[in-house]
Regions:
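Conserved C-terminal RecA-like helicase domain
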Residues: 4-169
Length: 169
């Protein structure tokens, strides 16, 4: 069996995405359990601060219901397919809308001959092929619209986007 082909099959991606959207609230305890969490209020400023510039984090205690979630896939092609399917299904069912962001490394996550993965490269996007870069640009535009930010896949703005996503988790 060709596992990669099976994992990227459109029907499988549709079913997995539907399951996640249908069961997300239950699996992440939305509306079920609450806890107090210190929410970072100035995410964009903290994410954009350079190494020399120190920004004080502004946190506010807030009652939160449920948990955030990370959905990891095998590679860039899978990320593109799932992202598109999530967008399609959420457009059809707005009541199941989630806030989704995409982060991927562009070292292709391929194993070296010794079985050790290379370090993730979050410094620049120059190694991306045109299609992957265009996809990432579109996903970052969606993110900017969702959170009223102004990131891109260029240089420092990409590093700041990466930090912003991490801080919001």
């Amino acid at each position: 069996i060709n596992r990669e082909k099976a994992f990227l099959a459109p029907e499988r991606i549709r079913i997995v995405t539907d399951y996640i959207l249908t069961h997300f609230d239950k699996k992440t305890y939305r509306g079920d359990k609450t806890y107090t969490f210190s929410v970072l209020k100035n995410v964009s400023e903290v994410a954009s601060a350079s190494g020399r510039q120190q920004i004080d984090e502004i946190k506010q205690k807030q009652r939160v219901s449920g948990f955030n979630s990370i959905f990891a896939v095998s590679g860039v092609d899978a990320a593109k397919l799932y992202y598109a399917e999530f967008q399609r299904q959420m457009a059809e069912h707005p009541q199941r809308r989630l806030k989704i962001a995409v982060i991927y490394s562009y070292g292709a996550n391929e194993e070296e001959t010794d079985g050790i993965l290379d370090e993730e490269n979050t410094e620049d996007t120059s190694a991306l092929d045109r299609n992957s870069r265009d996809f990432l640009d579109a996903a970052i535009r969606d993110y900017n619209e969702m959170f009223r930010t102004n990131y891109s896949a260029d240089g420092d703005k990409f590093q700041n986007y990466y930090k912003d996503v991490s801080l919001r988790m």
